Amino acid sequence: MQVLVRDNNVDQALRALKKKMQREGIFREMKMRGHYEKPSEKRAREKAEAVRRARKLARKRAQREGLLPMTPRPVAAGGAAGAARPPR
């Protein structure tokens, strides 16, 4: 995995790398491989994750159909939307 360092800004490159790794699921993979997981525990975890996904999907579908109220999105601490990050 590669990240470009622009203008010797290592902090920005590290943030970009961390975001890429998060998106790719590398941190989750490292956590899962950190210890042995019994097959029965793996099945139970995967089943619980599937139930969680199904509930989330059903909740989103109900909100779209108007059966549940839409949850308001949290407002950023910076105030106006997009003010925290300069345009590219």
From Swiss-Prot:
GO molecular function: structural constituent of ribosome
Entries under Pfam families matching the protein: Ribosomal_S21
Lineage: superkingdom: Bacteria
UniProt biased composition (Low complexity): 73-88
GO cellular component: ribonucleoprotein complex; ribosome
Alphabetical list of InterPro entries matching this protein: Ribosomal_bS21, Ribosomal_bS21_CS, Ribosomal_bS21_sf
UniProt key word Ribosomal protein: yes
Biological process annotations from GO: translation
Keyword annotations: Ribonucleoprotein, Ribosomal protein
TM ranges: none
Region (Disordered) location: 58-88
Family per record: Belongs to the bacterial ribosomal protein bS21 family.
Name of this chain's protein: Small ribosomal subunit protein bS21
